Each structure stands twice: as C-alpha cells, then as structure tokens.
C-alpha cells in the first residue's frame, strides 16, 4: 500500500535495509545501539532489519564491546564474501578488469592491451567479455555471486531507453556507440554465456569513476565539495557537490586555453588536453628536441622525460625536458584555477597514471600557478593534493557503481529482466492483415 508520498511499505523496508548496510559498510563494525542514531531509524526497526540481514547472510557478528550497563554489545559488519563485483577500466593503453569482494578487496585481475586496433569497439567488447570470464575463474567465484559489472570509459555517457548507455567519445573515435547493448548478445538482451541474465552493466565516464573512488575511499573522503582530476593521455574531471552527491563528469580537458592553438585529439584547437595531457606532453618534448627511446610507449616516454628533467644521479637537468615540464605545470595550473573559480571546492585532487607519475614535486609547481591565478577567496580555502588510490582508482570506482546499486536495492540481488508477454494470436493475425 502506498502512502501520501507514493512510497510503499516495501520501499520503506528497502530504504531501511540500505541505510543499515551503508552505515556498516563505511563506519562498521557497529553495535545495534550505535546504528540507531547513525541511520535515524528506531531501535525496533534496526533490530528487525539486522535480523533480516543476518538471515540473508549479508551481515555477520564481529566481536563485542563493553557498555555502561556491563552487558557487552555485539558488533556487526558487512560479510565480504556475500557477493562480488567487477570493475573495468577501458583505459588509454589497455582494458583492465578486476574482481572484488564486497569489501573491495581485490580477488583477481586481467589485462588486455588495446594494441594496434586501439579503441576498435568490437575489440573492446571482446576484451571486457574475456576479462570478466577470466577473473571469475581465477577468483573461484560463481557467476551467480556477481552483483554487477561497472565500466569506466572515456567520453560522455547518454542514458537511453532502448539501448542503455551510449558513449559519445569524440577523442577515441566513438560516435554514439551503444556500448551497453553491444556488451550483451545481439538480439537477445542477455549477457555473454556463463553470466546470469540479471547481472547488470553499469557504464560511466572514467573520470567520474575515479572521482567516486576517491570520494568514498581516498583523499576526498569527508569532503562536501571536491573536484577530482584525471590526468592521463588526456585530462578530465569529476565534480562532486552537496547537490550532486554522485558527482558529474565534466570535459575539462577541452577547455580552450589558447585560441587557434595546437590541434587536439577531439578535432578542435587550443584545448587544455592538447598542452597538458601526457600524449601532448611527450609530443611537445619530441618537437623541442627530446629523444625518448625508439618504440617507447607513452608511459615509458613520460618516465624518460621525468628522468631527463630531474636526474636522480645528480647530473645536470636537461633544459629542454625541464622547460616542457615547466610550461605544462603552467597550463595545468591555469586549468585548475578555472575549476577553483567555477566550483569553489574544498579539495582538488589529482589522479590518473600520469598525474601520479609526475608526483609531488611537479604538483607543487602546478599548485603555485593555480593559486596565483584563482580568485583569492576560493583559492584560500581549497586544498590541492594527489589522490590516494593509485593507478587502480578507475577500476575501484567502476566497481563502486554496482555496489551503490546494491545498497539502493537494500541488499537484494538483481532480478531477472522481465520479458514482455507474447502478443495473442488474434493480434498477430490482425497486424498481418493491416500491412
């Protein structure tokens, strides 16, 4: 029965279960008594919900703690083995697939290089299918335990009624790619063989996935407003505010920093990414006379640039490499100052493989430029730091997508998709006559 708000008893029950699960997940182990103020539920509701979750195998007891009355209170926590999650990072050089338990402990991983076909859609779909099957086998987890597959991809994600998540990835040559539909077997709407049909895909922007991971488990935890920057071959950002708790991806890398400037991968000129992305950074070093090793990939070339600019053995710095890094710090600082002025975050975090590889010394110079160019008030209250989760942050963030949906369902497993009932024979006959 629905109340005035339109919510049914089942809805309220699901929300109560979700509230208890989330508090135990982020703040557990906790006692039943501590859950009452933490969730805003009555003690009776907490007791009933906990009893259900224990019976479902989602929660387990984890010792006890003393109380003023002398009787110990039993502590509760999420049972990590009660389900598993897959996170996928469709990155710039490879597709990385990781299997996690509910506590986000890594159980297995698989990687597939993108190779000469690059972002060929069929190749990427095949890599995801193979990777999911591989990690489930390596982690010795049954497909029925899987709560969902989260995928972080470059580009703008459009949610559509008929095809699910559609990816608009201009810089990688994806124009309205119906990725969610392609990940399922054509014509059936089912997942690849071996996975139950009810296992859902959750597809989102890679920078947003990175941001979600840092906000839940990394350097952004506890902040109400933050911007998390992904610095790899290209650059992107995720903006998290109190009004948009899940965060939203912004195409920050395609902010124009020089009118009529360098050609960007997106086709425009003068984008920030054309100056500050790792691909552009290495290209500018080559143009200035730098010499990365023959056949070096992007990550290796960036490592060599850093070694030339900041030699570890006491040799003199290569002035060409040092000048390219200094100019890049200035461009990135200008881009960050725009984010500070626009969104006025408490924290501005830099992640992505290139951002982490460039490290703290480079960040100091970027921070100096950003704070010098931003408005004084927002600049005075923002902290600019490196992210904490390392190169796996996108896969962790992608796995958070099915985890968040699991909480929203109150800990219930995904249900099989309902198929429409077949049309009666008279309808088929009538349709045939009307053609």
PLM regions: where:
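AAA+ ATPase active-site-proximal loops
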Residues: 208, 235, 350
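Short, acidic Gly/Pro/Ser/Thr-rich loop/turn segments
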Residues: 93-95, 156-158, 236
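ATP-binding/phosphotransfer module of carbohydrate and carboxylate kinases, centering on a glycine-rich
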Residues: 1-64, 68-72, 77-113, 117-137, ...
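Short glycine-rich anion-binding loops that position phosphate/pyrophosphate groups of nucleotides
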Residues: 65, 154-157, 232-234, 354-355
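Glycine-rich phosphate-binding loop and adjoining helix at the ATP-binding site
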Residues: 106, 111-225, 251, 361-372
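Glycine-rich phosphate-binding loop of actin/hexokinase-like ATP-binding domains
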Residues: 219-276
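Active-site glycine-centered loops adjacent to acidic/histidine catalytic or metal-binding residues
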Residues: 206, 232, 398
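Short, ordered coil/turn segments that flank beta-strands lining enzyme active or ligand-binding pockets
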Residues: 81, 102-103, 160-162, 241-242
